[in-house]
């Protein structure tokens, strides 16, 4: 993977420094399949400047020991955890997971935010950002560039 990314960057004539603008999402199940091998690859990707986010956290067999060793910048909480917000036990578990991720210094992103109750809970617990239909509908591929331009114009 490291070689493939490096090759694409060189082939496109992209300055290597631009890699710091790219965030790579890696699924939890992939990292936990061979964590030792994954750690070595993640360290190389980090050295290239890539930001690395663990995707689908809570959907598989995460290990706190590995979570603290991986050179991550963020963790995306699986939508199944977010869906259960409002149930006391689920709220406690999700709150604890957010506290743990934040204690490790990673940004937190919640996937599948579809209700105001979910958004309010996540804000209260200090979740950094969210993804879901409540916040924005999926954008068709052919409209992405114009939506990004509009967003940039609104920020200016």
Question: Locations of the language-model features?
Answer:
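Short helix-capping segments at alpha-helix termini
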Residues: 12-19, 48
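Conserved functional hotspot residues or short segments at active or partner-binding sites
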Residues: 41
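Conserved hydrophobic residues forming the short capping helix/wall of the S-adenosyl-L-methionine
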Residues: 9-13, 101
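A short, hydrophobic coiled-coil helix within the histidine kinase transmitter core
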Residues: 4-8
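EAL-family c-di-GMP phosphodiesterase catalytic domain
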Residues: 3, 21-34, 48-156
């Amino acid at each position: 993977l490291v070689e493939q990314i490096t090759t694409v960057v060189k082939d496109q004539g992209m300055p290597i420094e631009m890699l710091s603008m790219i965030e790579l999402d890696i699924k939890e199940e992939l990292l936990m399949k061979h964590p030792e091998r994954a750690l070595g690859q993640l360290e190389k990707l980090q050295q290239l400047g890539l930001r690395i986010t663990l995707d689908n956290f809570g959907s598989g067999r995460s290990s706190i020991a590995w979570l603290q060793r991986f050179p991550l910048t963020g963790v995306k909480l699986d939508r199944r955890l977010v869906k259960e917000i409002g149930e006391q036990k689920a709220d406690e578990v999700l709150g604890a997971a957010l506290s743990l991720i934040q204690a490790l210094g990673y940004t937190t992103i919640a996937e599948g935010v579809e209700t105001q109750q979910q958004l309010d809970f996540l804000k209260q617990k200090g979740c950094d950002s969210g993804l879901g239909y409540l916040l924005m509908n999926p954008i068709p591929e052919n409209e992405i560039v114009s939506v990004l331009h509009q967003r940039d114009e609104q920020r200016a």
